[in-house]
């Protein structure tokens, strides 16, 4: 493990979008602008190839390019976490080894997501995976996509391996997340991270270490400031910033009637901000001009002066 990653990992760790020019063409210049934008905004680490990064819609070639270019651009300035979730344990290990070769600091794994797994099978899966990994591992709970929740006792069992250093929860279930925090209370070096940005501040107030929040792609300073307000229990500032986060959630992520609205809105906003392309991997499509106008209006209402292009 590189010395630059503090344990437990804390703060705002944006799940990077994967900037695309076509289904199998990485927008490398856009990725450069995005990473510099995030570093300038004070984020604490980078997380690539997660759900926001459209990993499961990308070819292995493109995933490899994303890993290589992210590590090259970051240049060790902050930790890089790489998601290796896959239906094939062999491919997960291959991605982990490539991530290590290019200087990443940790890997992240959700359960294999095609066949539904039980808790004993989850334990066996990670007992098989962990000895093959060259980097520390974060467990990733995404039950809407994987059809299974990590039971708190399962996390305890898997985390008996010292190579498991944290947990990212995207269930949006605060009772569940608190149950996991309670189960892991005797392991202070185990990083507890929450995915939904709407829940980040309250989670940090109650002891979580930070958030893996998609909106930080657009406004890293906002999410870092909200994290700091929660960390310092500055309730007045927290309420003010939380309102901004909820405004983003209620406007930029809700254009359209489909589950892809979050991703399309986020990428459209990044395009309007001049950061990267708004191309979305198949089977989805980027917003048409009418929806783009709604995102432009949402940015204007947030006080961001951008030109509608």
Pin down the residues of each PLM region.
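A general structural signal for well-ordered alpha-helical segments in protein cores
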Residues: 31, 63, 67, 92, ...
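Structured C-terminal cap/extension of enzyme domains
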Residues: 26, 201-309
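Catalytic alpha/beta core domains of metabolic enzymes, predominantly
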Residues: 131-132, 145-249
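Alpha-helical structural signal in soluble globular domains
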Residues: 41, 65, 69-73, 98, ...
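Active-site beta->alpha loop and helix N-cap motifs at the rims of alpha/beta catalytic domains
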Residues: 2-149
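Active-site-adjacent beta-strand anchor residues
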Residues: 82-85, 140, 170, 193-194, ...
């Amino acid at each position: 493990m590189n010395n630059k990653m503090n344990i437990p990992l804390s703060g705002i760790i944006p799940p990077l979008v994967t900037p695309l020019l076509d289904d199998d063409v990485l927008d490398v210049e856009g990725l450069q602008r995005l990473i510099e934008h995030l570093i300038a905004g004070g984020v604490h680490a980078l997380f690539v190839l997660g759900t926001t990064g459209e990993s499961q819609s990308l070819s292995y070639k493109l995933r490899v390019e994303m890993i290589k270019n992210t590590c090259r651009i970051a240049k060790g300035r902050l930790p890089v976490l790489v998601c290796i979730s896959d239906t094939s344990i062999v491919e997960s290990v291959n991605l982990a080894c490539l991530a290590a070769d290019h200087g990443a600091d940790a890997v992240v794994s959700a359960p294999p997501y095609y066949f539904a797994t039980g808790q004993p099978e989850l334990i066996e899966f990670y007992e098989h995976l962990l000895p093959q990994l060259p980097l520390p591992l974060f467990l990733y709970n995404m039950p809407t996509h994987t059809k299974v929740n990590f039971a708190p006792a399962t996390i305890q069992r898997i985390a008996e391996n010292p190579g498991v250093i944290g947990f990212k929860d995207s269930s949006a279930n605060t009772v569940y997340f608190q149950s996991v925090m309670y189960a892991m209370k005797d392991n202070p070096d185990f990083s507890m991270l929450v995915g939904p940005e709407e829940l980040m501040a309250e989670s940090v107030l109650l002891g979580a270490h930070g958030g893996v929040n998609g909106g930080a792609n657009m406004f890293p300073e906002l999410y870092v400031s909200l994290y700091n307000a929660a960390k310092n229990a500055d309730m007045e500032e927290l309420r003010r910033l939380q309102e901004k986060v909820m405004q983003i959630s209620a406007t930029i992520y809700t254009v359209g009637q489909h589950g892809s609205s979050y991703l399309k809105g986020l990428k459209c906003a990044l395009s309007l901000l001049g950061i990267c392309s708004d191309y979305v991997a198949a089977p989805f499509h980027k917003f048409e001009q009418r929806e783009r106008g709604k995102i432009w209006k949402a940015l204007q209402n947030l006080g961001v002066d951008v030109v509608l292009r």
